[in-house]
Amino acid sequence: MALWHDKRGRFSLLRAVTLPILVAPLIALIYFTLTHDLGARPRTEAIHEVGLWGLRFLLAGLFITPMRKIGRYALLIDIRRMIGVAAALYMVLHLILYIVDQAYDLGVVVSEITLRIYLTIGFTAWLGIMVLGATSNDYMVRELGGMRWRNLHRLVYPIAVLGVIHYFMQSKLEVFEPTWIAGIFVWLMLYRYMHWQFPRGDEFPLWVIASTWFAVGALTFLLEALGFYIAFHAPIGRVLLADFNFQAGVRPGWYVWGAGALVTLIGWIRLPRASREPQFRPAQ
């Protein structure tokens, strides 16, 4: 069955739009490789790029559940597996390019993974996502049974944690994107925890969703400031003030707040019209 068909074999516009989005980063990477635009260390840049896109798509897959509920887009479930498999394939390429960069010397590769803790963490996450990728098909769902399959795929949460930690550690001082990615991941986990702790038949009110985004964004600002204090002994208050000086660029916390504003706006737009309009009661 073609990738742009749904499970019933019908053409799916959503899948047809998603497929080129998933392939676009790889096409761009090939183009920049052929035009020698990957910088002074093209192999290293390629390794980092495919790994980063793998992590981005992993988080995009985790976004499907909240957007289905908050945005009332039930059809999004149709592309969750596609996004997850794409994340796994980018991670496969991530390791292949690393092996190529080590001149195909598997002894060196094993030694590096064993001796460098950030590579050990990354490889552990890689093994996990390979298991999830290999079982992301209807055959494995039938073989394992629905309950066992779902329990297995809950491993995506610790895998994502390891992936974010690996990204932080290999980034060293360039932690801008790892910080906002971590902030968004924290919100995704908080959202799931809320639904687990307070099961509801319907979605949480939008003011609750917006409040959680605000809190996680504030936490992102604070943790970034704490990181600067630990690394450079920069006063936390001064770092927090600098977050509101856009001449130095937009800091990670703003990305988290921006994502929260977008999710909340989508949720508001998708509300039934009667829920959006103020309700007036006649005077008694």
Where do the model's predicted regions map?
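Membrane-embedded alpha-helical bundles that constitute the cytochrome b-like, heme-associated redox core
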Residues: 1-284
